[in-house]
């Protein structure tokens, strides 16, 4: 039996007081395309303190006393392993730590616990220190530390003393002068660095507590790697903050991309992400400067932890490899063997067994089961329109990675970069084979709302699409319902093109509200709580209710009523142009407006000074026999509206146009009834890649029709 569902919706349009009726007919018996079972996933990047002080559950900031960048974020020093942290005027400054109860603390730079650590802390308690008046240090955490009644906290630290000494120590969390969690214990410390572990429970709640480590008698102790963890997601050691990880799990992700983003590349070779320095015991990880987003990373949440989190979320891991490019420079493309080997070793670490070097290291690090890594992205935003940007020889780099990875791991799916900005239709401009292409879109709500059909024209025989980064980033504040609805329309379009779009991920996910480097973000948090934007709930709604396939639909709607009276206009966007011969006629041949040469007497010669100018530099050449109109500014939204008001139900607009310079093409304005209500034919927009008709009603924009295309200069 054929089932037909009919839905009728009424929407009010800003241009007129009339309503438009649309009827959507759904035929559930006629199958369309299969929807990708891996469509919705996560894009994770260390940005906005997403990990440090966020998803990575470590509560103590500057736990290894390495960070000395307070107040001088743009200075760097070389510690023998490359750029890491800044050098303040006072090298003894230890950010986020302070002395309490008359104690003295100093940076220790000799006799360290290993070759990775460059500093430790030497604590000397007050000569009057006692159990009633202890003396020591405190840490402010990442804008506070949450204390929770009943939660178990795990403190680990490394210590040594000048001689074998038994210390009485009080530690815990304190807020407003009161202990919210506390434990007093005794430890014998020797001149050899040793690791100590203590647990204690919270006895009261506080949103912004501080951590204290106090000596109950005079003495000197050297400390390093002072670490405090609350209960973690799935009780993983060195794991994730529960509420943030649970919010990720509630999105039902099918994959998790990591570690970025620009975080992959860094601002130099030394500040790029190197996975081999992020595995093993945390005290053996040097950390690195997250130069792109302006803060140091412990790399406590490293490659191993990313793989573990993906497994815990039920998501496939998607690892982004560096192709020898960083922001502002690169390794010559014919000298990238080290980067290729790093990628091969990363796959071996994830998937190898005990007979392999890196598989054995994974097992030694506590994860016997392989991680089934089969998705590798080759580079991040490295294939741009302008080859003089950071995308130096991306195609040649990609080809080397493809050959090496497919030879050893033929099952691995490789994701290539395409243009990440400057166009709505990025393309793979080389002959190398590729499994998926990564497209990025950061646009307005109206752009997304107009893009339901975006993928309709894509080649069904070409590479699959991974829309790896997308979000409304303008006209949305910190994220609102309008943004979420625009994204939802775009997401439905991806589902409707399931034979093309295989994967998609919103970006970015997290922001610590105390250090926003990007806006908007899906999940916001501070030390005590987390909350989500409307976009987060749309992501969850779509992922939890994704179907297996589409069905046939037919949409019929009344046309938007045309205005009774209107004007027309000309425009340009970051382009210099010339126009002549503007002519507006009715279907029966009646002329409503005509741009004529200065010698004509039938119609007055056009003088652009009489037009309504929105922006740009406009001039009309009254001496030219054709009366040419020129726009010579390189600026956005350069529009000139003809002063003549016309009246007709249907009409044709013709004009001759020539592009003389700039990035795009022409704008032909019609149905203009005011600055906030008009339509235009956008020829060669979006970086000279696309033609489109766009409707602007009450300043909101939709795109009823579009097609790929470009124009040449001086034609």
Regions found by a protein language model. Give the residues of each.
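Short carbohydrate-recognition loop motifs
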Residues: 108-133, 619-639, 651, 690-696
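Catalytic-core region of carbohydrate-active enzymes that cleave or remodel glycosidic bonds
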Residues: 308-309, 400-413, 428-431, 435-545
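Extracellular carbohydrate recognition and processing domains
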Residues: 176-206, 560-562, 704-714
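Extra-cytoplasmic beta-strand recognition segments
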Residues: 61-68, 121, 136-169, 194-201, ...
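Secretory/extracellular carbohydrate-interaction modules
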Residues: 633-701
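Aromatic- and acidic-residue-enriched carbohydrate-binding clefts of CAZyme catalytic domains
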Residues: 42, 73-122, 264-303, 335-339, ...
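Active-site cleft segment of glycoside hydrolase catalytic domains centered on the general acid/base Glu
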Residues: 176-187, 195-197, 202, 230, ...
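Extracellular beta-strand ligand-recognition surfaces/modules
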Residues: 23-26, 195-228, 363-365, 560-574, ...
């Amino acid at each position: 039996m054929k089932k037909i569902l009919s839905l009728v919706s009424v929407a009010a349009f800003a241009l007129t007081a009339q309503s438009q009726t649309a009827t959507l007919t759904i035929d559930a018996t006629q199958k369309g395309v299969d929807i990708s079972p891996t469509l919705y996933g996560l894009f994770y990047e260390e940005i906005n303190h997403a990990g440090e002080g966020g998803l990575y559950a470590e509560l103590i900031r500057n736990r290894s006393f390495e960070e000395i960048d307070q107040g001088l974020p743009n200075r760097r020093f070389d510690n023998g392993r490359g750029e890491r942290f800044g050098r303040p005027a006072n090298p003894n400054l230890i950010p986020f730590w302070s002395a309490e109860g008359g104690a003295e603390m100093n940076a220790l730079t000799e006799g360290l616990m290993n070759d990775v650590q460059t500093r430790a802390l030497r604590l000397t308690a007050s000569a009057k220190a006692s159990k009633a008046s202890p003396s020591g240090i405190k840490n402010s955490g990442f804008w506070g530390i949450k204390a929770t009644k009943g939660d178990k906290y795990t403190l680990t630290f490394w210590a040594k003393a000048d001689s074998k000494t038994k210390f009485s120590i009080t530690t815990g969390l304190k807020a407003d002068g009161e202990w919210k969690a506390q434990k007093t214990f005794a430890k014998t410390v020797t001149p050899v660095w040793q690791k100590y572990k203590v647990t204690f429970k919270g006895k009261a709640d506080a949103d912004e507590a501080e951590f204290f480590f106090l000596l109950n008698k005079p003495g000197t102790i050297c400390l390093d790697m002072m670490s405090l963890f609350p209960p973690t997601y799935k009780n993983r050691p060195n794991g994730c903050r529960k509420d943030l990880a649970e919010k990720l799990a509630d999105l039902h992700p099918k994959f998790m991309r990591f570690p970025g983003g620009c975080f992959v590349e860094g601002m130099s070779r030394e500040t790029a992400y190197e996975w081999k320095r992020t595995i093993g015991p945390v005290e053996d990880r040097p950390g690195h400067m997250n130069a792109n987003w302006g803060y140091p990373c412990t790399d406590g949440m490293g490659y191993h932890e990313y793989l573990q989190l993906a497994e815990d979320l039920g998501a496939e891991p998607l690892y982004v490899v560096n192709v020898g490019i960083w922001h502002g420079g690169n390794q010559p493309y014919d000298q990238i063997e080290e980067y290729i080997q790093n990628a091969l070793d990363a796959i071996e670490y994830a998937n190898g067994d005990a007979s392999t070097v890196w598989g054995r290291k994974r097992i030694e690090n506590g994860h016997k089961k392989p991680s089934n890594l089969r998705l590798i992205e080759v580079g991040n935003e490295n294939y741009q329109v302008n080859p003089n940007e950071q995308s130096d020889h991306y195609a040649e780099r990609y080809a080397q990675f493809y050959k090496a990875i497919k030879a050893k791991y033929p099952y691995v799916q490789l994701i290539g970069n395409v243009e990440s900005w400057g166009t709505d239709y990025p393309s793979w401009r080389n002959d190398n084979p590729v499994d998926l292409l990564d497209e990025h879109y950061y646009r307005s709500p109206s752009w997304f709302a107009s893009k339901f059909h975006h993928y309709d024209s894509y080649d069904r025989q070409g590479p699959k699409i991974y829309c790896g980064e997308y979000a409304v980033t303008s006209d949305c504040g910190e994220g609102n319902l309008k943004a979420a609805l625009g994204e939802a329309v775009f997401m439905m379009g991806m589902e409707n093109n399931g034979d093309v779009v295989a994967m998609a991920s919103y970006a970015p996910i997290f922001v610590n509200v105390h250090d926003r480097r990007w806006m908007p973000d899906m999940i916001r948090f501070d030390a005590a709580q987390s909350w989500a934007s409307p976009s987060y709930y749309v992501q969850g709604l779509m992922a939890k209710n994704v179907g297996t396939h589409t069905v046939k639909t037919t949409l019929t709607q009344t046309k938007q009523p045309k205005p009774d009276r209107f004007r027309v206009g000309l425009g340009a966007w970051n382009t210099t142009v010339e126009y002549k011969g503007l002519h507006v006629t009715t279907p029966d041949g009646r002329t409503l407006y005509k741009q004529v040469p200065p010698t004509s007497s039938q119609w007055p010669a056009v003088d652009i000074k009489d037009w309504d100018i929105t922006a740009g530099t406009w001039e009309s050449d009254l001496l030219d026999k054709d009366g040419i109109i020129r726009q010579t500014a390189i600026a956005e939204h350069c529009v000139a509206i003809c002063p003549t008001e016309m009246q007709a139900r249907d009409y044709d607009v013709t004009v001759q146009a020539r592009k003389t310079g700039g990035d795009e093409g022409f704008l032909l304005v019609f149905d203009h009834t005011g600055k906030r209500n008009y339509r235009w034919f956008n020829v060669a927009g979006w970086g000279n890649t696309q033609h489109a008709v766009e409707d602007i009603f009450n300043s909101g924009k939709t795109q009823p029709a579009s097609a790929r295309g470009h124009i040449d200069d001086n034609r």
